[in-house]
Amino acid sequence: MKRFLQFCLTLALLLAAIPSMAAVTVRGTVTDANGEPVVAAGVVEAGTTNGVVTDMNGKYTITVKGADSVLEFSCIGYETQSVTVGNRGVIDVVLEVATSFLEEAVAIGYGTQKKADITSSVQSVKSEDFNKGAILDAGQLIQGKVAGLQITLPSGDPTSSTSVMLRGYSSLLGSTAPLVLVDGIPGNLSTVAPEDIESIDVLKDGSATAIYGTRGTNGVIIITTKNAKRESPATVQYNGYVSASHWLNTPDFLTADELRAKWAEGWTGKGDISEDRKYTTDWLKEISRTAISHNHNLSIMGGTQNHTYTANLTYNDNEGTIKGTGRTNIRGRVQIAQYLFDNKLKLSAEVMADENNSKTGFNPGYTYRQACIQNPTQPVYIDNDPAKGYYETDGYFYDNPISYLNERIGMRRSRNVRFNGVAEFRPIEQLTFKALYVRKGQSSIRGNYNTHKDVSTTEQGLNGTASRGTSELVNDLLELSANYQQDFGNHHVTAVAGYSYDETTYESFSMSNQNFPTDAYLYNKMQAGMGLTEGTSSQESYKYNTKLIGVFARATYNYADRYLLMASLRVDGSSKFGKDHKWGYFPGVSAGWRLNNEEFLKDVKWIDNLKLRAGFGITGIDVNSPYQSLASMNYSGYAYVDGHWNPILVPARNANPDLRWEKKYEYNLGLDFAFLGERINGSIDFYRRDTKDALYNYSVPTPPYTYGSMMANVGHIRNQGVEVLVNAVPVRTRDFEWSTSVSFSYNQNRLISITPPKGSELSLSTNYFDTGYTGEPIQTSTHRVKEGWPIGNFFGLKSVGVDEAGKWVVEVLDEDGKVSGYDYAENANSSDWQILGNGVPDAFANWNNNFRFMNFDLAITMRGAFGAQALNFQKLFYGNPTIAYNVLNSAFDKIDVVDMTTGKPTGKTAVISDAQRYVSYYIEDADYWKIDNVTLGYNLRFKNAKILKALRVYGSVRNLATITSYSGLDPEIRTVYGDDGAFDPGTDDRDKFPTIRSFTFGVNLTF
């Protein structure tokens, strides 16, 4: 009986336990902070597809697996909450309103401001919206993301960086690059690893950038890095990827078989292309490869109540698609912060360091050109035997490209170190004092050596040539500022004032030598070359020091979240300008009106934000080089005095005490909007910016001046345009979400004036200047910059066709610039030149889409440029069958034969049989639309895991597809002018490192 009773008791206990292991039904109500029911909120059992939605009263009922189940409560506009069921049958939840994007803090320079309160043209991009894949620098992260910000990388060179221009050309001699700040400190787009960036804010109009004075004309890009938060657990993240790249397109030059077929058809060719040398060589294949690159980023961060720490290390090996090219980079960053005296004092210190190593022995673009034009029937080596040396001929500018790869050896190593310390003291809640000190050091060393086998040395009978150079830059920055904010009822006021001292010292040394006893020394034993004793070596050194001192202030006012005002002033002093104009004054002012908070719109619930903005600001442009206001002298020629030849010192630059800032005056009118719970938001901006006192070089009389030209402030440039941005979330459900962003920008540029005022000693022979250059053998300019014209105009002969013999026929102009007849291009002169197009796009458009389905995400970035033309240099030089090099297949295209009297087509066609000539036939429309970046990812989170918290794997394709009518390799062509200051946008250089397409596989791990 006892055993029976024990059995019954055990059975009863087991039966009693069954309900706790069975399904559990939970009921409850979901409300907001005001106690109002949240309708259609999702209630989901975590890790399953089991879910329900709340009814009109916010009530729900759901059956889950058991007590260990976790319920997730979510709704658009609210923060998601997770609750473990336990032994409860009723669970009521209060959802907190999600942080509005209008409440997000945006960096505006020397502080932050709520997006809703901003009265200037500012756009912010967060890390979750960055482009993915094999990203070169911060510029590529936001390429296609910011209206009006033109970011291009029209080169596959692994040592290149993105070119950036905002709202058009603002200077004739100055840079177009925006000021880049990394955590408030001047830097560049490569200062930090892309994986280490939290957000990027772009200040676009003058009212926003005026507080940066001389450095703010071209806009300001503010990069904020990822840093630990207080009381956050230690987190370790690894981000890595492997990428394979190849040329986007390959030019269609004749292969060996095609060349032999042309000979068989009766085409004889000229020079090096006229003889069958019995081999078959794919020269482009010989110099190229599929490039494999990899990147690894490791970071750790965490914090307690009183301190935070952040550390990261990145290694990048970027291999080039042309053999022998590549770059490796290693960089690290450590940041610590300590909070003292009840958080009244914050001390932080940061060290950043990086090292870049690249191969620079040969010019990859010129090597690519040589590979294009080589005879495909000739071998790489004599008799195809490397021991016998390279196969070379006596062709003009015609060298074996494999010789360049193997016999031109070089390196460049640069190291950068940045230390900064910050002290922030807050005696009261409303007032903060800040002191920032930064010291940056940059050093580089470079060396190049051409062996005794290189064509440049064999032609000159030399035993190797070498060059070596070093440079060092040290920058010190001190900034002291005070920040105040206070609320007085409906009045909110902020103010910041400060002082900035920025000093830079740069020095460099370089030398060259030749005739070395052995190639083994390379560039490492410069004294061994005989050029030192033969008098053929060279040495050069340089040093400069510049100072920039600034005092700045800004105040903002907000009344009842309706009326907004901002005013700023910066006073800058620069050592680069004349003694009478060292200082410049740069004010900015803007205002905003939030209509949605007015009584007449308060009841319109679908409007979340509707704000009118207007702003005006003046910014300055510093000259690129120091000492331009001072006279200088150089040696030129020799004089025979007292039996010796002595070098003669001659004037090289006039003193100009009136040299001063270029000033940009910018007006901006904008509208910010957000509708339907912020699911639709964006902005519209109209702007006009006038650069006055633009610097240019003018002729001056001698005497009284000692030199015949002088830089002076005379020019006037105007840009005006519109920018539109629309963000939307068309679909958002528990399992699927689609967000999209569309932006459009249009800019009109014009050179208003460069003519000196009447009575001035300055003079110009014309109101224009020609720029750009075709190179050998055409040797002519490609562009004209003229008063009243937009910058970027192609200028040359307009072709209408050819005659029956294949000679170019062009328009002839009368004195009024109108067509008066037709003639052969060889008979035309510069008076027949006319505008042939413009290399700067009128408009840019971007369309970004992000999709999420369950744990998958898909990002598609598309962008395009419209209204520009391009000069197809490859077609200009090699689309002609009369040259002595290999040619493009298009060289044999049939062109319309025209009547020499009317210029109209006769119905006949002919192949070109004329010298290479710069005519409009080679200028093409360059509109394009690119599917630029496609990334597919899969995400996993491990909530209860002790080690691995999250995993993401992804695949990405960059430069996937291009829609264009342009016949060249890539219609995305440099529009930012080069370091030489040439305004020649739209020139598709024949020496350009080919654009690449890359395929990337990556993984992100969070521990």
Map each language-model feature to its residues:
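Short hydrophobic alpha-helical membrane-anchoring segments
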Residues: 12-23, 79, 359, 677, ...
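Hydrophobic beta-strand positions
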Residues: 30, 53, 179, 686, ...
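Surface-exposed, extracytoplasmic segments of Gram-negative outer-membrane nutrient-acquisition systems
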Residues: 454, 640-652, 690-714, 749-840, ...
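Short, P/G- and charge-enriched loop/turn segments at secondary-structure junctions
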Residues: 208-209, 283-287, 654-656, 834-835, ...
